Amino acid sequence: MISESIDTYRYLGKYIVSCQEKNGAIAWEPSSKIDPWDHVESAMGLDVLGFEDNSKKAYKWLVDSQESDGSWFSEYKKEKVTKFRKETNFAAYIATGAWHHYINFENKKFLQDLWPTIQKSINFVLEGQTIDGDILWAKDKSNEWMDDSLLTGCSSIYKLSLIHI
């Protein structure tokens, strides 16, 4: 039986906060790169550890940095885009994070406020779905869909692998 309380792990939340920039973005390490997937993972860590205000700042960054097509670029450094790919699994993951935040804080207003951003991100993901049902991995720097679908089940996106014999 585990006897530690959540307070035992608050130092981890403090570390995540040390990686958070003023605009709410959470880097891999202080002053390091930012990607939307790990950013959401970090926000969920903040949720579990009780850092609600910092988590909300993280989601605000997602709202503020979302592209008009509902996506995010795959990598940022400070406020500059460093990788221009737009990945479907990154776009979909905000929905998972938002639900996680709700489970921790039961804040319906948070979900309502975030809903337009989630809806745009899911629409982006669905635009990448092929006739076979798989979801293309990403758009490239030219904003064209890449002809590739991931086999991973990440972000609760089902991606089908077609085997051609």
Task: Give residue ranges: language-model regions.
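Low-complexity, Ser/Thr/Pro/Gly-enriched N-terminal "stalk/linker" regions
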Residues: 1-37, 48-72, 76, 125-132
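Extended ligand-binding clefts on enzyme/binding-domain cores
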Residues: 2-4, 10-11, 32, 112-116, ...
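Carbohydrate-binding/catalytic loop surfaces
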Residues: 23-41, 49, 71-93, 97, ...
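Residue-level signal for cytosolic alpha-helical hairpin/rod architecture
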Residues: 39-40, 158-161
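Helix-terminus loop motifs that line ligand-binding clefts
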Residues: 50-122, 126-129
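Conserved small/polar residues in nucleotide/adenosyl-binding loops
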Residues: 163-165
